[in-house]
């Protein structure tokens, strides 16, 4: 069966979840994404073909929706996996003619539901199955019921955060506090200050290190190691403590190692990291 995976969102989280989903189901689907790190070749997902909209395709909603429909018609999948946003990131999948006769499956993670529903105009795809891949809030659980598809809880596989493995390329020093984030420089600096202040409050003198995509942040002191690496699993397994935002993937990966995970939720347009953090603390 020809399968396509639809993950528009731009951030690394969608591609990381794509990798985890394909690992679990042993899939190598077609991929529709707008991730810039995939476009640049810095990340090479195990997918064929990989289809990315260009600048002209993304100039406005109608152009983007036209590209999406054409891309799906070129792939002609029998099944479409829709990541995170059931109507697409802008609502482009609502009433999309190209989805007729295609089995649509939705991967449901936490949404800022009030913000997301403002983007929807029309009818969502007719899903045949919904995978609920994390604990959701009550409002979103009720919304899933309106989609009239069977809901199955699914825990995607992530590398252990407590494997104590050593990387072939990098070995972190003892008592290393690692900051991992794929967001912008302002958010990275917030996490750096969070880690530094935690050490001061506790009277600790750890060795710090940071993982982020791209060049070394200007604010980072010269004696702090910086790694532009994806994925960072081997470093996460070595660190004594991890400092991050509350994105879906890192929270899933650290679920069984929450004692070493320090979380600073960040505002997002369509995600609710604060809700995710609250639900995690209730477990």
Name each model-derived stretch.
Residues 1-209, 214-283:
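Nucleotide-activated sugar donor-binding and catalytic core shared by glycosyltransferases
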């Amino acid at each position: 069966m020809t399968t396509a995976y639809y993950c528009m969102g731009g951030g690394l989280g969608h591609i990381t979840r794509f990798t985890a989903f394909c690992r679990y189901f042993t899939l190598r689907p077609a991929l529709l994404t707008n991730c810039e790190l995939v476009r640049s070749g810095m990340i090479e997902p195990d997918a064929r073909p990989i289809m990315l909209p260009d600048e002209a395709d993304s100039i406005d909603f109608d152009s983007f929706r036209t590209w999406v429909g054409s891309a799906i018609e070129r792939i002609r999948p029998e099944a479409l996996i829709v990541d995170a946003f059931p109507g697409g990131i802008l609502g482009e999948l609502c009433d999309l003619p190209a989805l007729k006769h295609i089995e649509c499956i939705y991967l449901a993670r936490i949404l800022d539901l009030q913000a997301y529903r403002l983007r929807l105009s029309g009818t969502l795809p007719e899903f045949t199955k919904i995978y609920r891949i994390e604990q959701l809030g009550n409002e979103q659980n009720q919304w899933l019921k309106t989609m009239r598809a069977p809901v199955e809880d699914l825990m995607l596989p992530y590398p252990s955060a407590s494997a104590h493995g050593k990387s072939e390329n990098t070995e972190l020093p003892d008592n290393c506090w690692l900051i991992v984030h794929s967001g912008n420089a302002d958010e990275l600096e917030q996490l750096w200050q969070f880690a530094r202040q935690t050490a001061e409050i506790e009277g600790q003198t750890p060795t710090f290190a940071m993982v982020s995509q791209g060049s070394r942040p200007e604010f980072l002191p010269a004696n702090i190691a910086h790694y532009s690496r994806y994925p960072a699993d081997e470093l996460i397994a070595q660190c004594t403590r991890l400092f991050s935002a509350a994105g879906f993937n890192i929270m899933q990966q650290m679920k069984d190692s929450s004692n070493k995970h320090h979380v600073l939720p960040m505002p997002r347009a369509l995600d609710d990291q604060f809700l995710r953090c609250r639900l995690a603390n209730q477990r």
